[in-house]
């Protein structure tokens, strides 16, 4: 299954959560979800009871759409998380957080993960001094992520820096916003990752 490429604000309204897909509008308080916090369509404001399977599927969709992964990528990460010792759901979220496009987003070099993914694809990002153009590349603790020299005047990146200065950084990255580089200092604990996803339901879905 390919990545979702439809209207992202309709998707957020359908799932009922801010997925961080419209960065600038969200930061400006203009997101459609804030204005119309109900599902799109003629019957969007009606309350409907969702089945257990529906809830499980919804949580998987939230995580997939939020981090911008395909079904194949997401399932592979779940299988890897399931093989590791510890809480499978928490490990899954930690693996998603280690994606290069997500780390670029967390460092404030992009207003959305989709923009960060595009920057990586276009070769704007270096990892330990070497260009990496694979958004799913797994960043390890201690690695340096920077915007390459030729891209430091990119208007989208500079605009992202300006906007994300208002929101602050997460605890597990150290960023120099003047020199446009950051260190992924450690893998965050699950409780530090503020995303509206109940990964327990994802584990239940894949465990069937």
Swiss-Prot record:
Does the record bear Ribosomal protein in its keywords?
Answer: yes
Key word Ribonucleoprotein present: yes
- List cellular component terms (GO): small ribosomal subunit
S4 RNA-binding domain segment(s): 98-161
Which GO terms of type biological process are on file?
A: ribosomal small subunit biogenesis; translation
Q: Which family does it belong to?
A: Belongs to the universal ribosomal protein uS4 family.
Q: How does it assemble?
A: Part of the 30S ribosomal subunit. Contacts protein S5. The interaction surface between S4 and S5 is involved in control of translational fidelity.
> What is the protein name given in its UniProt record?
Small ribosomal subunit protein uS4
Q: Which organism is it from?
A: Sulfurovum sp. (strain NBC37-1)
**Gene name tied to this protein:** rpsD
């Amino acid at each position: 299954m390919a990545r979702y490429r439809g209207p992202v604000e309709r998707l957020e309204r359908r799932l009922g959560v801010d997925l961080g897909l419209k960065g600038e509008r969200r930061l400006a308080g203009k997101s459609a979800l804030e204005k119309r916090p109900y599902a799109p369509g003629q019957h969007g404001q009606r309350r409907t009871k969702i089945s257990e399977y529906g809830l499980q599927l919804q949580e998987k969709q939230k995580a997939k759409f939020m981090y911008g992964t395909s079904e194949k990528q997401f399932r592979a990460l779940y299988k890897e998380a399931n093989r590791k010792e510890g809480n499978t759901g928490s490990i899954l979220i930690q693996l998603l957080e280690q994606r290069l496009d997500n780390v670029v987003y967390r460092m404030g070099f992009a207003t959305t993960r989709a923009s960060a993914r595009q920057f990586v694809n276009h070769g704007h990002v270096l990892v330990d001094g070497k260009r990496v153009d694979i958004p799913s590349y797994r960043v390890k603790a201690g690695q340096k992520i920077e915007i390459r020299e030729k891209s430091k005047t990119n208007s989208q990146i500079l605009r992202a820096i300006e906007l994300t200065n208002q929101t602050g950084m997460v605890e597990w990255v150290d960023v120099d916003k003047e020199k446009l580089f950051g260190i992924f200092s450690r893998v965050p604990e699950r409780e530090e990752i503020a995303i509206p996803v109940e990964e327990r339901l994802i584990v239940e879905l894949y465990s069937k």
